[in-house]
UniProtKB/Swiss-Prot annotation:
This is Probable zinc metalloprotease EGY2, chloroplastic. Belongs to the peptidase M50B family. Its EC number is 3.4.24.-. One of its GO terms (molecular function) is metallopeptidase activity. Probable membrane-associated metalloprotease that may be involved in chloroplast development. It is an enzyme of class 3 (hydrolase). The chain crosses the membrane at residues 267-287, 311-331, 336-356, 374-394, 437-457, 484-504, 527-547. The keyword Transferase does not apply. Keywords: Chloroplast, Hydrolase, Membrane, Metalloprotease, Plastid, Protease, Transit peptide, Transmembrane, Transmembrane helix. Residues 63-133 are annotated as: Disordered. Pfam families: Peptidase_M50. The keyword Hydrolase applies. Residues 1-64 form a transit peptide. It comes from Arabidopsis thaliana.
Length: 556
């Protein structure tokens, strides 16, 4: 099994505004400072009147809230550039009516008016910088604030509270667009083109940009042309993906910074965790081949002969699993695919569930993934079948071997069919048969390879299905396989644990490939289908009774 780290998320982030600030205007590249200008005002009162008249004069103060200038993060239109040139000349937009109901007016005591005047006059001409808390660097926010004058005193405390409530509220801007606009323009104008991929629209995607459009020519050829042009313009700074949009099954191109693809480091070293899992898996392999240890684990310390008896079976099964992983490693190295250390998963029923191996880099295309995924099961099936046949032909060394009931061969269509073909009438219902233990040990290896080849999630079979039929079909097969295993779990403990393993560790999705559109060559597709077929033969039961009439079905 190979574990790698893809679903599309092309949703735009929503620009949310403070609920108490209805006059927010987003104007990029505004000047970095602002001033509050206060003037003199006159006020008249008629204290004896039933209705106290308050005369307010409104003066607009432009408070420009800026942040450190950084690269623009988004797929801005040409209006962005025009706004930069005209923002210094054009007057700010004024929305006076909506602010009246939102502003806070503080009634100051008459005795504090002179103190307030002195306090506010000292603020006149000072520069006020307010942090907006926006998660989107490079966007400068202009806030139009109406400062309300009352009774020759400016209600500055209310305005300051208003500024604070507006500016301290984080602006939920789209943080997924991290490519500068200049980079996007180069990608659209110089990297993509009529001869490769004609871009019609673009959307944010996982720290980069997703380009929709029309693919020209063969996907593999177009990908290489686009990749070469992008490397000529940006070097190794960005990574290109040519994928299929699951929404409409049309090709899309995705460009993301390579720094966003760096794997996360773990607190526990990989080799240490893999070694720990390997020791536990080796112990469970001993347990499976020594029934006495299953009932009394402490007896192993008193009688080492028990461990000696279980050593051959553990080594044979481990050999089949090791050849399986060796097949993955050899093919991956030939294709330049880096694999992590295998994590052997222990099992109380069959000794081990096989190994989980992480793919550490991006696979180039579906054919490469198919080769790596199919190499392990093909190697494991080949060795397992050879050992299984040897066990059926070679009699037990002690003349007794392992005595089993003939019904045990109903557990596997492949094992039952081969046994009936080679043993003939010696294999009959209701009778016991003496076998070479190598048959049972090799059968365990075949079963582990067969379950790993189920077309589900990130199992080898899941990767094979993805490589042959694409991501959407592989997802459907994963659901069907988990459902069938769930039904089988009602009758088999092994199926139950495999459902748990797949659902929590190997459910997927499979990490995106660099180019997912090109279908693999027919000869590799045939090998992949052969692996899936062998998995089906190993896991399905043998339905025919072991009698002289081979056409007789069990229970009929």
């Amino acid at each position: 099994m190979n574990l790698a780290v893809a679903s599309f998320r092309g949703n735009f982030g929503v620009l949310s505004q403070c609920s108490s600030c209805c006059s927010l205007q987003f104007q990029p590249f505004v000047a970095a400072t602002s001033s509050l200008n206060f003037g003199q005002t006159g006020t008249s009162r008629r204290k004896k009147d039933l209705k106290l008249e308050r005369v307010f004069r409104k003066r607009e103060t432009l408070v420009r809230v800026t942040e450190t200038q950084t690269e623009p993060e988004g797929n801005d239109d040409e209006d962005n550039k025009e706004g930069k040139e005209s923002s210094a000349d054009d007057p700010p937009t004024k929305i006076p009516t909506e602010l009246n109901s939102q502003s806070t007016v503080v009634n100051e005591a008459p005795g504090n008016e002179e103190e307030n005047k002195a306090q506010f006059s000292s603020q006149d001409g000072d520069k006020l910088e307010v942090s907006s808390g926006s998660p989107l660097p490079g966007v400068n926010v202009s806030i139009i604030i109406h400062v309300i004058y009352k009774d020759d005193s400016i209600m500055f405390s209310g305005c300051l509270s208003f500024i604070k409530s507006c500016c301290e509220q984080p602006l939920q801007l789209d943080d997924s667009m991290r490519l500068p606009k200049e980079t996007i323009d180069i990608l659209r104008g110089q990297v993509f083109g009529f001869d490769t991929f004609f871009v019609t629209s673009q959307e944010p995607y996982e720290g980069g940009v997703l380009f929709k459009g029309n693919l020209r020519g063969k996907p593999a050829t177009s990908y290489e042309k686009i990749k070469t042009r992008m490397e000529n313009n940006f070097g190794d700074q960005y990574k290109l993906f040519l994928l299929t949009n699951p929404e409409d099954d049309k090709p899309v191109a995705v460009v993301v910074p390579r720094r966003s693809l760096e794997p996360e480091t773990t607190a526990v070293p990989e080799w240490f965790a893999a070694g720990s899992f390997g020791l536990v898996a080796l112990f469970t392999l001993f347990l499976r081949n020594v029934p006495a240890l299953q009932s009394d684990l402490l007896s192993a310390f008193d009688n080492l002969e028990l461990l000696k008896d279980g050593l051959p079976g553990a080594l044979v099964t481990a050999l089949v699993l090791g050849v399986h992983e060796l097949g993955h490693i050899l093919v991956a190295n030939s294709l330049g695919i880096k694999l992590g250390v295998p994590f052997f998963v222990p099992s109380w029923q069959i000794g081990s569930f096989g190994a989980i191996t992480r793919i550490k880099n991006i696979v180039a295309k579906r054919e490469d993934l198919l080769k790596v995924a199919a190499a392990g099961p093909l190697a494991g099936f080949s060795l397992g079948l050879i050992l299984f046949l040897i066990g059926l032909f070679v009699p037990p060394s002690d003349g007794i071997g392992v005595v089993v009931d003939a019904s045990v061969f109903h557990e596997s269509f492949l094992a039952g069919g081969i046994a009936k073909l080679l043993l003939g009438d010696a294999l009959k219902e209701g009778t016991s048969i003496s076998l070479n233990p190598l048959v049972i040990w090799a059968w365990a290896g075949l079963l582990i390879n067969g379950i790993n080849s189920i077309p589900a999630g990130e199992l080898d079979g899941g990767k094979i299905a993805f490589s042959i039929w694409g991501r959407k079909t592989a997802t459907r097969l994963t659901g069907a396989s988990i459902a069938l295993l769930g039904l089988s779990a009602l009758f088999s403990d092994v199926a139950f644990y495999w459902v748990v393993l797949i659902f929590f560790l190997q459910r997927g999705p499979i990490a995106p490939l660099a180019e997912e559109i090109t279908v693999p060559d027919d000869k590799y597709v045939s090998l992949g289908i052969l692996v899936l077929f062998l998995s089906l033969l190993v896991c399905l039961p043998y339905p025919f009774a072991f009698t002289g009439n081979e056409a007789m079905m069990i229970g009929l």
